[in-house]
Amino acid sequence: MALHFQSLAELEVLCTHLYVGTDLTERIEAEKALLELIDSPECLSKCQLLLEQGTTSYAQLLAATCLSKLVTRINPLPIEQRIDIRNYILNYVASQPKLAPFVIQALIQVIAKLTKLGWFEVQKDEFVFREIIADVKKFLQGTVEHCIIGVIILCELTQEMNLVDYSRPSAKHRKIATSFRDTSLKDILVLACSLLKQVLAKPLNLQDQDQQSLVMQVLKLVLSCLNFDFLGSSADESADDLCTVQIPTTWRTIFLEPETLDLFFNLYHSLPPLLSQLALSCLVQFASTRRSLFSSPERAKYLGNLIKGVKRILENPQGLSDPGNYHEFCRFLARLKTNYQLGELVLVKEYAEVIGLIANFTITSLQHWEFAPNSVHYLLTLWQRMVASVPFVKSAEPHLLDTYAPEITKAFITSRLESVAIVVRDNLEDPLDDTATVFQQLEQLCTVSRCEYEKTCTLLVQLFDQNAQNYQKLLHAAPGLAVDMAIQEGRLAWLIYLVGTVVGGRLTYTSTDEHDAMDGELSCRVFQLISLMDTRLPHCTNEKIELAVLWFLDQFRKTYVGDQLQRTSKVYARMSEVLGITDDNHVLETFMTKIVTNLKYWGRCEPVISRTLQFLSDLSVGYILLKKLVKIDAVKFMLKNHTSEHFPFLGISETYNVGDFRCRTTFYTALTRLLMVDLGEDEDEFENFMLPLTVSFETVLQIFNNNFKQEEVKRMLIGLARDLRGIAFALNTKTSYTMLFDWIYPAYLPVLQRAIERWYGEPACTTPILKLLAELMQNRSQRLNFDVSSPNGILLFREASKMICTYGNQILSLGSLSKDKIYPMKLKGISICYSALKSALCGNYVSFGVFKLYGDNHFDNVLQAFVKMLLSVSHSDLLQYRKLSQSYYPLLECLTQDHMSFITNLEPPVLLYVLTSLSEGLTTLDTVVSSSCCTSLDYMVTYLFKHIAKEGKKPLRSREAMQAGQRLLHFMQQNPDVLQQMMSVLMNTIVFEDCRNQWSVSRPLLGLILLNEKYFSELRASLINSQPLPKQEVLGQCFRNLMEGVEQNLSVKNRDRFTQNLSVFRRDVAEALRSDGHTDLSSLDMMS
């Protein structure tokens, strides 16, 4: 779409396609046109045309979108133009306050971005973009509509100041945000609070939409102020339960005034739910205020006011019937315990009354289990932390938790059991299906349940016996009672979960022998129920009960089975009488019997199988447990009979989901750990263990050769690859790994190679095979350090080379792929290939020099495949997909460390691509990637420096090595900006960024400085000259100190000296730049 002839009508059609169009092609074309419009010299005039003459809100929105992108470009518009845009928008929204809300919001975002990016810019000795605060006050003096716009401007500005733009240096963002915090944020909060006081001072007309909108925007403004990232810690907002608000000390007076908290509690009681929940959100932040803001007496008084507010809300609970209010109030209660100690809470005058009200509120909430289930998390967090604090309370005041905690536990237990009948009869969504939430709530409950444990245990025993009896009656009753049976099974599932929870609670709370005996009473009943239900397999099954049983078994394992636990635990006293289980050896037998039973009868139920196998895997970690396990008959049976005949989940029927095959890796990892206990050097034992896989591979070979049943072969190979990966993962000794290698090579690796050739376009097949290859290449625990007479290392690498080359060549034939397919179809496989190659190059089990010596091209071939695959990937994709970047950059590090001859032989465009990828990787937030980039760059710079240093001297190196160095030097001379750009990036990181890998950054920086002293001098002068005169001398001294004692070489001693100097330099420069002078931050950017 050519832009030069676009009329207003054509632009409005573009808007329609962009915002409300349903045709995907038209929308993509509109997006392209939008990008062209932003780059067009006519952009501003077109935006003005749309704003002033556009007939739809979408036209105005397009103008705002274009302006937003225009003002945030890396190369900013002239300051005069930006001031004009800011003033134009202010006048525009002031003259048209009835614009669509989303248009006003979008235009105000442009003002906020302009203000943030120009915060330090000076014109005629004034910070021109800071005048926005004064401009807003004019809006606040106008109509209600103008007042709303003014508040939205302040709210957007506060949020924009708090927003980290990862495309710009984080240190610049922090400097702007800190200056805004120190100069403006407190005034904005005071202004917002005064507006709210004015609202409360006169009768509220809740029918007036404008007034409601004003109150909403002011509350959002207060919340933005309190949510500000005051310290620049960028805490993860999802970590809601651990948040402390780092209020600046200068705000103390606001927080010490009781009227401040009263204002928000009064607003909660006065406003309708949509607004009152915002008032509660503000109170959540007030309750989270850092403790150190107050002295001890002040903190006690502040806490007292918070508790009074809680009491008033709970005594007038009508507002809590709204889910939004209810959720925020639950968060508020949780934050109280996060920020205040139980010892402080019990000293509050109203504590006894309020803890009773909170307990009743919690019990009511638990009983109404279907109402706002996500909010229960916060209530359980409160009680969990209260109970966990009991041992540390030194106050004589009663905490009353021994009264209320058992009631909370009882309410949870009874409410969950009562919910089952409602869920089954009304066909509602079952809370048990959301296992993540169930596990989270149970882990919180386990601490609470151990407080006054006798009461909880008595209740559970009574309920379990009653429900078990009802279940047995139903088993012997006439058919046709399916609903009653479903209810009873659901109740039993909850009870098993709950028993597992309270048993697991032993680890979180002080326990006695009597408590252990109670655990035995409860556990007895679950083990009896397990036996009863397993006798009814396979005819009667219940997935929920099985998952609950596995939870219980895992909790019992963690609590009572292990190396460090006492063998004489009282838990076994009752279990010995009833079940004959006298110690953890007997328990392990029960565990393994249950595991084998599940694997036999639950083969097609993926949740049960995967949880069972995870339980088996957890059991198989730890030598002492393994020694006990291998003596158990059930384990011996598994080691000899791991076939689909005995364990159906190992089958390959077309009715089975290929995705479920993943669990086979877990199974074989655990099984191989068990095999390894007594394997030693017994090759016959290993051959017997591998027999089922041998049979499968021979079948595959036969079918492959006859060229039929290809779908069956593919499924078999997927399963075999996953099995072998599990086996290879567990073989961590040279002897055992050699047995596997001798088994798989040369007989079966070529089969996998053929599979890659045939099904290269099917990730379901190629991914397991490539992951197996990557595992085989891992020299974990030096397992691949074969004997000196063995060629196995080279043979393994040759096979890996063939497979990577085959995959690389075939995958490129797929051509271009859509965004949603490019990772699963192509990039995932490439990342696994790179990971495998990296393991080979760094594994130290292959002498790569022999390949060229003997004319073997496998090494060269795999490196060429690496290059071909790399060139098919864009730089943005390299960094966007984490697994790809975390395999590519460490691989490049290996290549630059040991194979610089390969790097120097790359064609100039390829070398430029590699160096550009390094440069972009240096700026990423992923420290694994950025550190790898620094190391790779250091190897390259060191190689180049050494070559230059040896020029003109008598050559000790081969002519070939000299030519390689010369090629790299010539390339750098032809492309001087490459290393200069990287030096700019590293200096920028040191001076302006939150540099988390300073040591890694320092290593290549010295070499870059020594190779580019002239450019380094220019960077130094640029930074120094951008500062006011008083700072110039300080910065000059910082740079002199940086190079003090540093010599013109890259010896380890010299590097270490430079690294030490750099640490001091970074600190001193940060201090020099810290003061809020007239510094234009854009001039400080060494990359601009």
Curated annotation (Swiss-Prot):
Entry-linked InterPro entries: ARM-like, ARM-type_fold, Importin-beta_N, XPO4/7-like
Disulfide bond keyword on record: no
An MF annotation (GO) of this entry: small GTPase binding
Main location: cytoplasm
Organs and tissues of expression: Highly expressed in primary spermatocytes and very weakly in pancreas.
Keyword line: Acetylation, Cytoplasm, mRNA transport, Nuclear pore complex, Nucleus, Phosphoprotein, Protein transport, Translocation, Transport
Cellular compartment(s): Cytoplasm; Nucleus; Nucleus, Nuclear pore complex
Superkingdom classification of source: Eukaryota
Modified residues (N-acetylalanine): 2
BP-aspect Gene Ontology terms: intracellular protein transport; mRNA transport; nucleocytoplasmic transport
Matching Pfam families: IBN_N
GO CC, one annotated term: cytoplasm
Modified sites of kind Phosphoserine: 569
SUBUNIT field: Binds to nucleoporins and the GTP-bound form of Ran.
Annotated family: Belongs to the exportin family.
Function: May function as a nuclear transport receptor.
Protein name listed in UniProt: Ran-binding protein 17
